Amino acid sequence: MKQYLDLLNHVMEKGSDRGDRTGTGTRSVFGYQMRFDLEEGFPVLTTKKLHLRSIIHELLWFLKGETNIRYLKENGVSIWDEWADENGDLGPVYGAQWRSWPAPDGGHIDQIANLVKGIVNNPNSRRHIVSAWNPAEVDEMALPPCHCLFQFYVADGKLSCQLYQRSADIFLGVPFNISSYALLTMMVAQVVGLKPGDFVHTLGDAHLYHNHFDQAKLQLARRPKPLPFMRIKPDVKDIFGFTFDDFELIGYEADASIKAPIAV
């Protein structure tokens, strides 16, 4: 995807070298935006092969409201292993905030259910927002949310989504985030009876770890291929009813994966 390669190149050429929490060191820019028209194909990297199974199962795990990695491990997904405790728990991370945000009266708010209901009943609202950043619980999370707030927008029979990501690991994290939120947009669009529009990805601290420079240069030397298309079973009309087998990526051709260390 040209949008992603442009981001990589921009950070390599224009970024500032800074320290970071992990001690690895980063080169970063503050404030960057990419836009993907979901009618033009499914936004997934073709300059390195991504593990789509992990992307889909992680999203389904979020939507289940789960915060233990048991479901992920059962489905061969290890991307959260480094942050889980000995019991597999992560604290009140994404799933808890999306599905069970604590309310002042002692109850809980299901932001995803409210989102779908709001789009159906009042599509022109400017309040179709889900937040994973809960200041009251952020210190209890194994990893505070990097992709922390998203908003939906309806126009001309299409549903678009904008994600704000406060912290963006460009080489390892951002490719997953692009595909994950593009897929979420398509899923929500299907259950509310709209066509997918744009996915807009807004980054706060967009950074490339110093030990990812060689991998980034290798990827920048590759030429992007045509985007594939995502086929979703059309009979699923409940946002919580999707399973892994409901998705099929058609025509995905990509260069070999590029390994890089995770900064924990």
From Swiss-Prot:
Gene Ontology MF terms in the entry: thymidylate synthase activity
Residue numbers binding dUMP: R21, R126, R127, R166, S167, A168, D169, N177, H207, L208, Y209
A Pfam entry, by short name: Thymidylat_synt
Active site (record annotation): C146
Disulfide bonds, paired cysteine numbers: none
Pathway: Pyrimidine metabolism; dTTP biosynthesis
Compartmental location: Cytoplasm
NCBIfam families given in the database record: PRK01827.1-3, PRK01827.1-5, thym_sym
Name the UniProt record assigns to this protein: Thymidylate synthase
